[in-house]
């Protein structure tokens, strides 16, 4: 069961109707303190955009950061029915069951632990990198690949399924 505040933050980001949010709104949506947000801006982890209303965050920038904070499975679950409207078909999760030698499972657990992430998160990131590296070859056989790899940098707007 997902914590209510995590669900609320994810939904606030992915279902946000405006293209930009203030620094304070962004910090609240990500669950960060003001000092964490200032550090992230200073370190280039997240970039501000200058708008006619001043410096703001593009909601897509927050969506990218959300993907770093939560797995796609968590995001999809938090979005509930709206997931099919927000997540492109190639991004929606599917269950994959596999069997690996014990040493590979142990290695995955150690490496994920070293990176302070779950095995699912680590594998999700590794497969994204693999698909991106093999994009040219895979694009011809996986119709939604380019859109899936580009997401969420493309506009986050509800789509008909």
Region roles according to the model:
Residues 6-36:
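Polyanion-binding surface elements
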Residues 23-31, 38, 94-108:
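Short amphipathic alpha-helix starts
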Residues 29, 47-49, 101-121, 125:
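Surface-exposed, Lys/Arg-rich phosphate-binding patches that contact polyanionic backbones
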Residues 29-56:
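Major-groove DNA-recognition helix of helix-turn-helix-type DNA-binding domains
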Residues 41, 52, 61, 66, ...:
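DNA major-groove recognition helix of helix-turn-helix
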Residues 60-93:
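A short, Lys/Arg-enriched interface patch at domain edges and termini
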Residues 115-144:
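Short, basic amphipathic alpha-helical segments that act as recognition/interaction helices
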Residues 133-161:
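Short, charged, intrinsically disordered terminal tails
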